Swiss-Prot record:
Protein name: Protein RecA
HAMAP family: RecA
GO molecular function, one term: ATP binding
Key word Zinc present: no
UniProt-annotated binding residues for ATP: 68-75
Keywords from the UniProt entry: ATP-binding, Cytoplasm, DNA damage, DNA recombination, DNA repair, DNA-binding, Nucleotide-binding, SOS response
Subcellular location, principal: cytoplasm
Function: Can catalyze the hydrolysis of ATP in the presence of single-stranded DNA, the ATP-dependent uptake of single-stranded DNA by duplex DNA, and the ATP-dependent hybridization of homologous single-stranded DNAs. It interacts with LexA causing its activation and leading to its autocatalytic cleavage.
GO terms for biological process, alphabetical: DNA recombination; DNA repair; SOS response
Subcellular location: Cytoplasm
SUPFAM superfamilies recorded: P-loop containing nucleoside triphosphate hydrolases, RecA protein, C-terminal domain
Amino acid sequence: MALSPEKEKALAAAMSQIDRKYGKGSIMRMGEASSKLAIEVIPTGSIALDIALGVGGVPRGRVVEIYGPESSGKTTLAQHIIAEAQKMGGVAAFIDAEHAFDPVYAKRCGVDVDNLLVSQPDYGEQALEICETLVRSNAVDVVVVDSVAALVPRAEIEGDMGDSLPGLQARLMSQALRKLSGAISKSRVVVIFLNQLRLKIGVMFGSPETTTGGQALKFYASVRMDIRRIETLKNGQETIGSRTRVKVVKNKVAPPFRQAEFDIMHNEGISRAGNILDVGVELDIIRKSGAWFYLGEDRLGQGRENAKQFLNENPALADEIERLIRAHAMAAPISIAASKADDVVDDAGLFEE
């Protein structure tokens, strides 16, 4: 609806005043801002998860939470996101609150450890201040905080072992996210919080599992991913990796409740070749006949492991298949089973600010 000349003039004056007072771009028409508001992403290193996220990766300028049980692949997934950001020419930082960063394994996941920024803070406030400084620098593309459970408030560290300080960590997270959210959006950085699970005592109905750090992170996160190990992969008696399932339990940039499965191998992290095979078969780009895998009429190998090895030995072919998968999936997203409502972590019963 067209505005009258008087209203148009008054609106232009108001917008001009806001821009002068708060800076250019403080207010704008959506049509003018469409190019700035387009969702930019960083791939996750798993094409199945990129498809499940609906936009091809984790969105820039947003908070992302990855949670799950111990040894489920949280850090591995975060390191693959770091590796993808570095491949795109970006800078990544890893805030190691758990003091357990393994540079050898990170290198296997594709991380350029020589150019990775690593910090091992002494307490929670220091970790979050470092995170804020990096975000406000506008020079970093990914910041990973490992983990929320290890962000121990300074008062708790300086107190006695038996002191009860309920809600202290939740208040710390709530305050930090209030300060960080605007800066994260403006800087286009992805801030990834890794989180652990805890069990609530006395729960009779629903899931007894919950995450640490209060309620704030659940609200501020645009994407929340629940990662679980569902199967152990073996070569004879030797364990060589695990089959992992990720459920996107919250997604503000695409439909939620999709899920993805992929292999995490001990010697390489997320298996790219295995991922390409699985998704390629699901999309009918790769044909499976008996034990054989085919691309068109060309054989890729007999058995999944042989086909994976063939793709690893022919990276140009793997790149071409991945390009076909992305073109097909992004044009018409594949149907990925939604998780049941009771699979989502229940938020009730936590101290929060």
